[in-house]
């Protein structure tokens, strides 16, 4: 049985050291989370699986790690300075602020229908309704009042202001003088660093079309209403690819990446049947998008929410950042750029003439991936003896701890010395973290490692060192290996243990 509430998952994450509230000892900071000892391991394993699949296992990909703070001109010409905003609305009764679409989505169906009726829109076309509310702010606030839109915090009908745009980028000052010439932004997405480094990568690697640039890194969005644990946060981490293709081949590559990404999620334990593919309606597309597929995972505690977007960005991005735009025959409509000093073109693979490539962008959030993987792995089981156990049935390559080595008696050197030697040998295999667990209570150790998803527990006992009562000589120099999922226990020779573990975890 999966987690039945977000609270259940949050409780496990804190109790077992996966995720903590940011700045918790000062009351916490909304939309910011810290990853604990096991959380950072799981997060790193997810990122490693993504990097291995998309960089190491392909011949057409390069990596990049661009800076977090960006020149304001980058985000001006990318369109973010003008368009990276959401309509917000305030309740004057309690000074609470909400994102317009989130507030409306939280209302009962009859309230939504009433708002739509007043605005002359259909409640079935939510995006068009939100667009109408944003376009007519005075009418929107009146519609909210007449329809009785309630404040999610107080539960009472609010006194709503006119909605107004709120730019979600974090602005910062660069250098010692704070003026209008010295500001920049924390990047709202990792993509722009890839586009501005396009020429550097091409020149240094001699890449030809098609090829991609992959990046994992932090991005920052000043969300109006961060919520649902790590699903919607203000500091996030992204795994993004910008895959550059010859114009005219973009639709074929779009389908290629859709299938590739669905397979990757399946390999991480997120079943394909739990992911709906949303072909984003034209009116909902981002300003740069020709077409976008959103992968909507059915979170057990949230319902269907976006886990990844796969966008056909056409030639918008490189076209926006390049000089000499008028000479390049761009398909996308871009603002004139007199600030860039680079011509972001590449030889066409057939004609050898300079061309601005189209871009296919698979973009996934590490935090949302964490939440999906944890949600899918979280299992409550009733054992044969009637006891209940919680177990994280993580894929072994994602498990924060691969193996726990447990001495049955922590005060007996004969046993602890063998356990420590086994731990050192297994750690040397390079499979991930191996933990020496000397809590002293084997039952509690098993339960703890079930909850954190450790695939195998290796127990060194008295039989291992020939000190057990009526010890069977065949048990000497063997250990008990317990399987997390089946609870089966098997005696394995110490001399064969490393190979046994390698075969199971690889």
From Swiss-Prot:
ATP binds at residues 221-223, 231-236, 306-307, 365-368. GO terms for molecular function: ATP binding; glycine-tRNA ligase activity; protein dimerization activity. Its EC number is 6.1.1.14. PROSITE patterns: AA_TRNA_LIGASE_II. Pfam families: HGTP_anticodon, tRNA-synt_2b. It catalyses: tRNA(Gly) + glycine + ATP = glycyl-tRNA(Gly) + AMP + diphosphate. CDD domains: GlyRS-like_core (cd00774), GlyRS_anticodon (cd00858). The keyword Nucleus does not apply. Keywords: Aminoacyl-tRNA synthetase, ATP-binding, Cytoplasm, Ligase, Nucleotide-binding, Protein biosynthesis. Substrate binds at residues 99, 189, 236-240, 361-365. Belongs to the class-II aminoacyl-tRNA synthetase family. Catalyzes the attachment of glycine to tRNA(Gly). Homodimer. This is Glycine--tRNA ligase. It comes from Deinococcus radiodurans (strain ATCC 13939 / DSM 20539 / JCM 16871 / CCUG 27074 / LMG 4051 / NBRC 15346 / NCIMB 9279 / VKM B-1422 / R1).
């Amino acid at each position: 049985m999966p987690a039945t509430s977000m609270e259940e998952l949050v409780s496990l994450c804190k109790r077992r050291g996966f995720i903590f509230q940011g700045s918790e000892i000062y009351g916490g900071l909304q939309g910011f989370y810290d990853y604990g000892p096991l959380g950072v391991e799981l997060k790193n394993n997810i990122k490693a699986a993504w990097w291995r699949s998309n960089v190491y296992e392909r011949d057409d990909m390069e990596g990049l790690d661009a800076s977090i703070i960006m020149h304001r001109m980058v985000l001006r010409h990318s369109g973010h300075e003008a368009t990276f905003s959401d309509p917000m609305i305030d309740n004057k009764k309690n000074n609470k602020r909400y994102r317009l679409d989130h507030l409306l989505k939280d209302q009962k169906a009859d309230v939504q229908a009433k708002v739509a009726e007043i605005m002359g829109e259909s409640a079935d076309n939510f995006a068009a309704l939100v667009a109408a509310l944003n376009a007519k702010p005075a009418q929107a606030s009146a519609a909210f009042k007449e329809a009785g839109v309630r404040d999610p915090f107080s539960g009472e009908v609010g006194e709503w202001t006119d909605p107004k745009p709120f730019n979600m980028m974090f602005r910062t000052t660069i250098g010692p003088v704070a003026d209008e010439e010295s500001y920049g932004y924390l990047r709202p997405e990792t993509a722009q660093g890839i586009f501005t480094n396009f020429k550097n990568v091409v020149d240094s690697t001699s890449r030809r079309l098609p090829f991609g640039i992959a990046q994992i890194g932090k991005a920052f969005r000043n969300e109006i209403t961060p919520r649902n644990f790590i699903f919607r946060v203000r500091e996030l981490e992204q795994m993004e690819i910008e895959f550059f293709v010859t114009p005219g081949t973009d639709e074929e590559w779009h389908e290629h990446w859709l299938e590739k990404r669905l397979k990757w999620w399946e390999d991480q334990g997120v079943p394909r049947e739990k992911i709906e593919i949303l072909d984003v309606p034209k009116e909902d597309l981002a300003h740069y998008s020709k077409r976008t597929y959103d992968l909507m995972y059915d979170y057990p505690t949230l319902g269907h929410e976006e886990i990844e977007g796969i966008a056909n960005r056409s030639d918008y991005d490189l076209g926006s950042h390049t000089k000499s735009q008028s000479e390049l025959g761009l398909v996308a409509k871009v603002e004139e750029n007199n600030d860039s000093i680079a011509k972001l073109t590449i030889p066409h693979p057939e004609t050898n003439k300079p061309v601005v490539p189209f871009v296919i962008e698979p973009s996934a959030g590490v935090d949302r991936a964490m939440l999906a993987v944890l949600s899918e792995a979280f299992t409550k089981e009733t054992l044969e003896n009637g006891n209940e156990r919680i177990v994280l049935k993580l894929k072994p390559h994602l498990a924060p701890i691969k193996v726990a080595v447990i001495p049955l008696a922590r005060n007996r050197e004969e046993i602890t010395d063998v356990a420590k030697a086994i731990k050192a040998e297994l750690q040397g295999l390079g499979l991930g973290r191996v933990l020496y667990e000397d809590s002293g209570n084997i039952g509690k150790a098993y339960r703890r490692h079930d909850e954190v998803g450790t695939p195998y527990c290796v127990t060194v006992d008295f039989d291992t060192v020939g000190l057990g009562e009526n010890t069977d000589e065949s048990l000497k120099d063997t250990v008990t290996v317990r399987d997390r999922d089946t609870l089966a226990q098997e005696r394995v020779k110490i001399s064969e243990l490393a190979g046994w573990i390698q075969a199971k975890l690889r």
